UniProtKB/Swiss-Prot annotation:
Disulfide bonds: none annotated. The gene is lppE. The keyword Lipoprotein applies. A lipid is attached at C22 (S-diacylglycerol cysteine). One of its GO terms (cellular component) is plasma membrane. This is Probable lipoprotein LppE.
Amino acid sequence: MCNRLVTVTGVAMVVAAGLSACGQAQTVPRKAARLTIDGVTHTTRPATCSQEHSYRTIDIRNHDSTVQAVVLLSGDRVIPQWVKIRNVDGFNGSFWHGGVGNARADRARNTYTVAGSAYGISSKKPNTVVSTDFNILAEC
């Protein structure tokens, strides 16, 4: 009787350990972000995303280039607040809601798209303010 109890207890422990190992959360790596600036598409490392209150920040860093976008989450709507583009193909520029440039944003599950035009300076025309189209696709 004592041997059966030890055997049943041992089997129960093995089954419990197996089930708990299967029940642990699996993390799936995020996809690479895609940036299109002035018609040229770049695939970068996955975006770093954070959220404070209703504002989601999407931060994409790749070598010497940086793109940051902040969107306001309001119910099902995603409203772009600002985008800063630094040193992407020699372009440095910004979009600001109610200010310079224009943008629209969309969210499909956990993938954000922010697209529009930014004003700034390009190394191609360093003495002229230019408007450049951008498209950001990032998973958060």
